[in-house]
Amino acid sequence: MKTSFLAAAAISVLSTGSLVAFAQQNPAPAPNMSFFVTSSNPKGGNLGGLTGADAVCQSLARAVGSTKTWRAYLSTSTVDAKTRIGNGPWYNFKGERIAQNIADLHSANNKISADTALTEKGTKPNYLSGNPPAPPAGQQLQHDMMTGSKEDGTKDADTCKDWTVGDGSAKTMLGHADRLGRNAGVNSWNAVHASQGCGMEQLQPTGSTGLFYCFAN
């Protein structure tokens, strides 16, 4: 009986320790989190349209405990990204406000940067850093975010054919989440340059792994 009790107590201690370690390694997002950069995207530009892209945002958010309704910040030939994401304000994983409203988000006053553009897990993608800006040594640069949008949040001509193409037959407009570039003044978070294509092999050379922004509306 004593042996069984000690064994049960040991298991309890180990389980508690494991839970504590898990919590320490996987901190929960701030309750008001309503903005994040996707932590992954294995599909490139072929997201299954806006419905598929929204599903990616929703799935990633739910995996970290968010019950909000999430939308991808992506435009199509008939939809402007800025009309999809609600009215704000929006906060990142840490609870830091990145914009008060739509106008603020698409102005020079927004707070999206290498320090605030965090994933749903609170991690930072491989952004540029230093002076001059350079990617992490030996790692794939990830600062190009797919948006298919212009700086004002309206549709651009390049949207990976409305997010249904994942090869070199189409392109997407990209923004710099870290607000840095090799050229001075190139710092828009949602519209800097077009990709070489919509597959991973075309996205990676310019600094993308197909990541994009998600907002809770």
Regions found by a protein language model. Give the residues of each.
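Positively charged n-region of N-terminal signal peptides that target proteins for export
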Residues: 1-4
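Bacterial N-terminal signal peptides
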Residues: 8-18
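Secreted/extracellular ectodomain signature
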Residues: 22-217
